[in-house]
């Protein structure tokens, strides 16, 4: 909500001031004041939690990391999350796509960009989370989001770049924002489906984060280079690569669902939970 409100205020400032450079200056001053106020407020509002940092806590264990990676389904979940994040980051380029390919009005592009980045999250996250709970399978919901995202990406590629069709393209951008944000909001949830023991769950989540957020290392440099070299023709390439990531993500999720069915069916889950309960009970008895 905060991002949407601040973003709309920024867009309003830019739209209200005729000189773009002055508008940006005023916007930056506004943001600086907001950050300064929040910084001062945090000193008084954020409590000091005693013992928040445990100096005796066990450090990173390579053995646990290897065990987490070897756990059935973890690799598929990690690569799927990598693809989810890659497609999610690719949605950033739908804003310049509207500007450069459709010559869309700047204010329209700003509003659509804000809705895609912030506003859609108010709906997509809860809706997709509800679906995942209803179906009892985040992986299936993410798979569906991938399929819808691929369909929209194909629409971006084949849609004629007619300025009169800017509103239709903007609608596709919002739909794409919904599917990508929705998938991203539950992107790490498949870990809960593969019944990772709690003693290594944190390590597995860390591995997922390292692999999943890796697109940040290269994707913007890559796509930016394509735009510099090819101009508006680059968007066909960018959306093509986004489709590639989506297809790879679908394959990984299908393999993950097969792994879940093979290793973590109802009977297997019961046995795993019984074994873990026995292990915990044995540890408590020893203590």
What kind of feature is each model-predicted range?
Residues 195-231:
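A late C-terminal transmembrane helix in Major Facilitator Superfamily
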Residues 138-190:
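C-terminal transmembrane helical hairpin of 12-TM major facilitator-type secondary transporters
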Residues 49-78, 274-277:
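Juxtamembrane intracellular "pre-TM" segments in multi-pass secondary transporters
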Residues 1-15, 209-219:
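Glycine-rich segments within core transmembrane alpha-helices of 12-TM secondary carriers
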Residues 19-32, 222-246:
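A membrane-interface helix-boundary motif in multi-pass transporters
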Residues 32-53, 252-257:
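C-terminal membrane-cytosol helix-exit motif in multi-pass small-molecule transporters
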Residues 124-137, 227-228:
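Helix-to-loop junctions at the C-terminal end of transmembrane segments
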Residues 72-126, 184, 189, 219-220:
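Extracytoplasmic gate region of multi-pass secondary transporters
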């Amino acid at each position: 909500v905060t991002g949407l409100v601040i973003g709309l205020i920024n867009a309003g400032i830019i739209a209200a001031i005729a000189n773009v450079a002055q508008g940006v200056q005023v916007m930056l001053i506004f943001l600086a004041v907001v950050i300064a106020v929040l910084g001062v407020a945090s000193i008084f509002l954020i409590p000091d939690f005693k013992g928040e940092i445990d100096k005796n806590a066990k450090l990173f264990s390579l053995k646990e990391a290897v065990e987490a990676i070897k756990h059935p389904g973890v690799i598929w979940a990690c690569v799927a999350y990598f693809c989810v994040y890659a497609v999610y980051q690719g949605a950033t380029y739908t804003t310049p796509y509207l500007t450069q390919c459709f010559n869309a009005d700047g204010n329209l592009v700003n509003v659509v960009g804000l809705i895609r980045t912030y506003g859609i999250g108010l709906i997509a996250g809860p809706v997709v989370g509800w679906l995942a709970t209803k179906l009892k399978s985040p992986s299936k919901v993410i798979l569906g989001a991938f399929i819808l995202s691929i369909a929209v990406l194909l629409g971006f590629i084949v849609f004629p770049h007619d300025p009169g069709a800017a509103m239709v393209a903007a609608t596709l951008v919002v739909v794409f924002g919904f599917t990508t944000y929705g998938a991203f909001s539950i992107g790490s949830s498949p870990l809960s489906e593969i019944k990772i023991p709690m003693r290594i769950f944190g390590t597995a989540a860390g591995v997922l984060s390292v692999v999943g957020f890796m697109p940040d290392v290269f994707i913007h440099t890559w796509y930016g280079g394509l735009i510099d070299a090819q101009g508006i023709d680059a968007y066909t390439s960018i959306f093509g690569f986004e489709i590639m990531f989506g297809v790879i993500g679908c394959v990984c999720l299908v393999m993950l669902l097969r792994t879940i069915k093979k290793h973590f069916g109802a009977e297997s889950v019961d046995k795993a939970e019984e074994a873990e309960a026995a292990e915990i009970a044995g540890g408590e008895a020893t203590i």
